């Protein structure tokens, strides 16, 4: 009996060394993956991921795409960088849809034509004539016209006299001459849509960059260049609406300023393609380049103020433009100086570090510019 049991035990199939090794490899691979997908500290990063030595921990390093995409819902030092601009992207997408459906795209000439007769009979024609001649050329959109007509002196007249009829005839001719060019060249809104498109592209590119850059060196290089292109696009297109609408009656300066800021934006994108542009030593250079792009818009703003210094609309818009510039400029300073994390390294790894503040200021500046464009 003992010999028989021993023979059965000997005949029982034994696990091969290859099978045992495979099990150990699978177990080891799972353990390695678990360790690999953990967040690491700055000193463990490859060189291409080292950007801010004041952010000590909570880095993702060379994760696979699937894990990176899932990390959008987890906590790490890029979480708020992704979401601040991703929320901004959806916000500007909604504003673009709202603008296309709610804000008039051209001068409502037909509405103006039907409403003018009644309005003319209810206003002081002398005041109307002088106001239209002095203010309409610089603000030809229909809501400006209607605002002017409604805000003329409230005197009413029930019986037209010869003087009123002469003024009415003069107003009719002058108004026709002023609005006639708009029939053949209606006021376009492409500059405003260009700005909205630039903002959408910038915010989406930024979110994508912060989410995917930790995958590999090649992906990081591509994503960062896309991010720089988005910043240049936002800055350049931000000047399209104020330049176009301020100088639409002066094609030379309109084309000059639009061409200059466009060429400057393209040049900035080309410079950003250089590998050295991403190095730590060029951090201040990067911020200065984008700051210089924004500062170049000071020329058309001052030019506009010289021409329309007595127009309330121009002063109102300039106020918003100055606020926008301050927000963008403050963002560039925070980005370059890496405040506040340089004061307390490691304390702002998850929330409150300079790049997150920079993102918030960019979105605030873009929203300010949107309000100015309305």
Swiss-Prot record:
Cytoplasmic side: 1-79, 213-228, 278-288, 335-347
Tissue localization of expression: Expressed in roots, leaves, stems and flowers.
Family: Belongs to the ADIPOR family.
Function comment: May play a role in abiotic stress response.
Organism annotation: Arabidopsis thaliana (Mouse-ear cress)
UniProt-annotated location(s): Membrane
Ranges per topology, Extracellular: 101-191, 250-256, 310-313, 369-374
Membrane topology: Multi-pass membrane protein
Pfam family, one: HlyIII
Gene name in the database record: HHP5
A Gene Ontology BP annotation from the UniProt entry: response to hormone
Name the UniProt record assigns to this protein: Heptahelical transmembrane protein 5
Any single Gene Ontology cellular-component annotation: membrane
UniProt key word Protease: no
Domain of life: Eukaryota
InterPro entries according to UniProt: AdipoR/HlyIII-related (IPR004254)
Keyword Transmembrane helix applies: yes
